[in-house]
């Protein structure tokens, strides 16, 4: 989860988030090199006393500064497209969970079980226990098995919402009348926090998401206790 004064991304807990962090570093390095080159050229232009008044065109230079940016854009686009298609792939999910956005809470339905659904509301500040996080804790966490592909079906009952868990690389819009899907996979057990990431009304900031990833055996015991 995020912590105060954090500058970087949250620790990756899914293969998709690991790919996104690698792509971020890859792109940032290209931007840094281009910015350094531009600043260097600007400093040369400001400090040099040499001028050339007879040059009207330079075909070689124009060719270079046309081809080189195209190559750089390709180097950025190829890994970006690869990750984009990876995020859309859902191969043999072991579980499907439907989440619906409401003003201002989330509801979850485990479609592989006959009667396993619940609403998830934020716990008010005056009801928090010691050690719990303000505006991030909920009364009912969504529990899922770790290290397994899980399909999330995401929609909304009223206005636009967005279901987002940054450390898992997830952010999917919840749109009324439309069913979006995403893949959830976690490399390790833990509790992961997110929030609605689309302004949806006066209590938009009171729509936290808490996702608890546990081993498969514990998940089976949890599901049996609720059905």
From Swiss-Prot:
Keyword Acetylation part of the UniProt annotation: no
Co-factor remark: Binds a dinuclear copper A center per subunit.
Keyword annotations: Copper, Electron transport, Magnesium, Membrane, Metal-binding, Mitochondrion, Mitochondrion inner membrane, Respiratory chain, Translocase, Transmembrane, Transmembrane helix, Transport
Intrachain disulfide bonds: none
EC number of the protein: 7.1.1.9
Catalysed reactions listed for this entry: 4 Fe(II)-[cytochrome c] + O2 + 8 H(+)(in) = 4 Fe(III)-[cytochrome c] + 2 H2O + 4 H(+)(out)
Binding residues for Cu cation A2: 196, 198, 200, 204
CC annotations in GO: mitochondrial inner membrane; respiratory chain complex IV
The protein's role, per its UniProt record: Component of the cytochrome c oxidase, the last enzyme in the mitochondrial electron transport chain which drives oxidative phosphorylation. The respiratory chain contains 3 multisubunit complexes succinate dehydrogenase (complex II, CII), ubiquinol-cytochrome c oxidoreductase (cytochrome b-c1 complex, complex III, CIII) and cytochrome c oxidase (complex IV, CIV), that cooperate to transfer electrons derived from NADH and succinate to molecular oxygen, creating an electrochemical gradient over the inner membrane that drives transmembrane transport and the ATP synthase.
Protein name, entry field: Cytochrome c oxidase subunit 2
Provenance organism: Taterillus emini
Originating gene: MT-CO2
């Amino acid at each position: 989860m995020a912590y105060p004064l954090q500058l970087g991304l949250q620790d990756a807990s899914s293969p998709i988030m690991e790919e996104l962090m690698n792509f971020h570093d890859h792109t940032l390095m290209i931007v840094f090199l281009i910015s350094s080159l531009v600043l260097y050229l600007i400093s040369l232009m400001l400090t040099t006393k040499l001028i050339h008044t007879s040059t009207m065109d330079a075909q070689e230079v124009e060719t270079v500064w046309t081809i080189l940016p195209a190559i750089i854009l390709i180097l950025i686009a190829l890994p970006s497209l690869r990750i984009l298609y990876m995020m859309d792939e859902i191969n043999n999910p072991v579980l499907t969970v439907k989440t619906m956005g409401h003003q201002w809470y989330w509801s979850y339905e485990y479609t592989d079980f006959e009667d396993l659904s619940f609403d998830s509301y934020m716990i008010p500040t005056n009801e928090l226990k010691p050690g719990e996080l303000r505006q991030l804790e909920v009364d009912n966490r969504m529990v899922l098995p770790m290290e397994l592909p899980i399909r999330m079906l995401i929609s909304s009952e009223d206005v636009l919402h967005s279901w987002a868990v940054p450390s898992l690389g997830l952010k999917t819009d919840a749109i009324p009348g439309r069913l979006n899907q995403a893949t959830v996979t976690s490399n390790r057990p833990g509790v992961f926090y997110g929030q609605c990431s689309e302004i949806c009304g006066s209590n938009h900031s009171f729509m936290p998401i808490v996702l608890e990833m546990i081993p498969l055996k514990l998940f089976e015991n949890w599901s049996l206790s609720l059905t």
